[in-house]
């Protein structure tokens, strides 16, 4: 699969077949990160049965930055990431290559990232085991990331980010008046405040019914960092009226 469209369809076409068999009508679709980008594309192609779209820290909302720092001028760690991404090396491949050391590495990452949530040892182990096994499983959709997204470092802020090759701000439109809610964490590495707010304003001018909400005390995994506020938002905004 080479084009962005082909890689997006790899995900959303099977989802449509599944939901059609379930005979779902008037439902709310919620997607996170790359899943948010894919959910928006799903709604553009198959949105006639959707009542609402909720995007949690979606990738690819703002436009590509006009000026970026080239790979040769990046710190060594960033150059390695750029090289790996360009070669389509995925986190799953790295975990699988580590063999029996993989579970320990994933456990350490989970324990460090979510230390503030106060999970006990058993909770951390369960989440770590889950993430390890879905990451170490035979690769499939992970190989599409390079075709859909691209890591870039903005020249004006020297801030790294991941952007869509076909940003949502340039393509998001729906045949029906579909309400769209975008949520980011206040410490979310995908939330570029100025650019995301401008994207939302542009989409509103284009006629979309879209809102942007920032969830406090949360990062990219806002549903874990602040589940109360995220859950309350979803439950309070799932009306079909």
Please report, for each region that a protein language model flagged, where it lies by residue:
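Flexible "cap/lid" subdomain of the alpha/beta-hydrolase fold that forms the substrate-access gate
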Residues: 2-16, 20-21, 25, 30, ...
